[in-house]
Amino acid sequence: DLFNPPGSLAWVTDLGFVPNLVRERIRKAQILVLESNYCPHMLEADNKRPWSLKQRIRSRHGHLSNHSTFELLNSYNSSCWQKIFIMHLSKDCNDVNLVCQQFKELNGQGNRFKTFVIDPLTAEPHLV
């Protein structure tokens, strides 16, 4: 909101894993923008990407999978989050509806934040 800006924003993409320092910093953010790049099954089935690229995507120097991102968010007992934006979804190896379905569980746990998934094709937010 322009007239009531958040105290802090964390923008976390292009990680193959989340170091402890990043884990601690994102806990304090009011707005969190986080990647959920690929579905492991869709990545494995993708015929366009060579094996070496798939290995890099899955590595510590690659991207976070849907499962990794969900587990990261689910691991916090408390945070300052007001809004979470899940983005940087692969157009070929992920699906907005799949991500929305998986992350619905976070909102069902009595959390006070809103979760949005950003469509990679339209850039539109989908409220989870």
What are these regions (language model features)?
Residues D1-I31, H126-V128:
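Core dinuclear metal-dependent hydrolase active-site scaffold
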Residues G110, D119-V128:
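Long, positively charged, glycine-interspersed low-complexity recognition regions
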Residues P19-I118:
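Cap/insert and terminal regions of metallo-dependent hydrolase folds
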